[in-house]
């Protein structure tokens, strides 16, 4: 058990240095000039993790409360990826009270190299908060391979979502040029026309070479059908969490 724990710690904070297929130093400085995706980052991650099974990998999730639940879609996605790749995986959840991560939680085991999953989902916070705390959300000794961005509900509804994420995206590309970025188009909010804020989001991200996982389209938009899938006006209920899990895992070509 001690050996396993040590392996998981290594997986949480360390990853190999590699050249990502869709990121480079130029993109870090001028993200709007990125070329369209040739292969989705999620599939590239899975293929690379299979091809180099002994090498550790690191995933980072930055976002709001929709990804923060300890029994929600994010850890479920982690467990499914761990099982598919036969890699041990551990995660830490961000705490907005301490502005730091909590204790490590194991998500799976396996004989191959470990995967660390930093869940920087911060309830009630926006992309600017992630930018301000980036040096703690992605510790100095971590080298992320895949960074998922899950923002929308806490952003300014009067400003295009893609525009609001630009400062964070630019900083991520500057600091982590070898990491692939993935943006999640969040599920609808009850009583709000979130479609207006996210209009053009997918095309804007695609133009920058950032894959979009479309959770929004997996949900109904009318309030009556949406209500059972939310535990409040925004955050998914257990049934909604399952839709999130299934949709995100499809992007990795992993069964829920």
Model-flagged regions — what are they?
Residues 148-154, 165-200:
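Active-site segments of SGNH/GDSL-like serine hydrolases
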Residues 40-48, 101-105, 127-139, 162-171, ...:
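Alpha-helical scaffolding within the catalytic cores
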């Amino acid at each position: 058990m001690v050996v396993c724990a040590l392996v998981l710690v290594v997986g949480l904070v360390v990853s190999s240095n590699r050249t990502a297929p869709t990121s480079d130093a130029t993109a870090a400085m001028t993200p709007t000039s990125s070329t369209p995706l040739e292969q989705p980052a999620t599939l590239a991650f899975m293929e690379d993790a299979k091809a180099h099974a002994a090498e550790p990998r690191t995933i980072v999730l930055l976002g709001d409360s929709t990804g923060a639940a300890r029994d929600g879609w994010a850890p479920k996605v982690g467990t499914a990826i761990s099982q598919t790749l036969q890699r041990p995986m551990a995660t830490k959840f961000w705490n907005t009270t301490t502005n730091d991560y909590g204790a490590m939680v194991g998500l799976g085991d396996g004989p191959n190299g470990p995967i660390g999953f930093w869940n920087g989902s911060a309830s009630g916070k926006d992309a600017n908060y992630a930018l301000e705390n980036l040096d703690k959300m992605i510790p100095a000794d971590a080298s992320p391979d895949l960074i998922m961005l899950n923002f929308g509900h806490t952003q300014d509804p009067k400003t295009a979502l893609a525009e609001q994420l630009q400062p964070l995206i630019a900083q991520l590309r500057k600091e982590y040029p070898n990491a692939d970025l993935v943006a999640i188009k969040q599920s609808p909010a009850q009583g709000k026309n979130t479609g207006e804020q996210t209009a053009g989001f997918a095309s804007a991200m695609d133009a920058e070479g950032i894959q979009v996982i479309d959770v929004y389209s997996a949900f109904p938009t009318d309030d009556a059908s949406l209500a059972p899938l939310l535990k409040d006006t925004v955050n998914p209920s257990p049934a909604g969490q399952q839709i999130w899990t299934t949709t995100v895992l499809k992007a990795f070509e992993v069964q829920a």
